[in-house]
Amino acid sequence: MEITEDSKRKINYQIRLATLSDIDQIIRINRSALPENYPYYFFVEHLKEYGQAFYVADLEGEVVGYVMPRIEWGFSNLKHIPSLVRKGHIVSIAVLEPFRKIGVGTSLLQNSLKAMKDTYNAEEVYLEVRVTNYPAISLYKKFNFREVKLLKHYYADGEDAYLMAAPL
């Protein structure tokens, strides 16, 4: 368990592994913060399968952010010679608006990436992000993600996405 204090607003939040009892709050955050939403069972399945890398930010019992990953085998997004690797996939990450820009997303991502590497033996990680989501792209670049590919019309509303990847 990690306690983080934000010096700007004196907010103490805890980064911890998600539990089944967090799912309703995670779905609430997903629906309020992102246009891409998933059904209840999708979150439950990811928690059951990849729970050691599925983290939430907890502020006095209220979940204010989450990161939902999965682990898979596939072709490397980073190597020039095609090779199969075990890789992490950040399926969804979101933080409630009042808790953005104070390090919550950074802490969530840091913990999940470490678990992907240490617990699940992933060699690299990837994600998709809207090309206009500049704050998220900036966050990912802090973790050495790079834009690997442009995915045209990736989202339901027609917006393009970047496929971004980083070594672990």
Swiss-Prot record:
CDD domains: NAT_SF (cd04301). Transmembrane segments: none annotated. Its EC number is 2.3.1.255, 2.3.1.258. One of its GO terms (cellular component) is NatA complex. The record marks S76, S83 as: Plays an important role in modulating multiple conformations of loop regions and contributes to protein thermostability. It is found in: Cytoplasm. The keyword Cell inner membrane does not apply. It is an enzyme of class 2 (transferase). PROSITE patterns: GNAT. InterPro entries: AcTrfase_RimI/Ard1, Acyl_CoA_acyltransferase, Ard1-like, GNAT_dom. The record marks E36 as: Plays an important role in substrate specificity. Keywords: Acyltransferase, Cytoplasm, Metal-binding, Transferase, Zinc. It comes from the Archaea. Belongs to the acetyltransferase family. ARD1 subfamily. NAT does not require a binding partner for activity. This is N-alpha-acetyltransferase. It comes from Sulfolobus acidocaldarius (strain ATCC 33909 / DSM 639 / JCM 8929 / NBRC 15157 / NCIMB 11770).
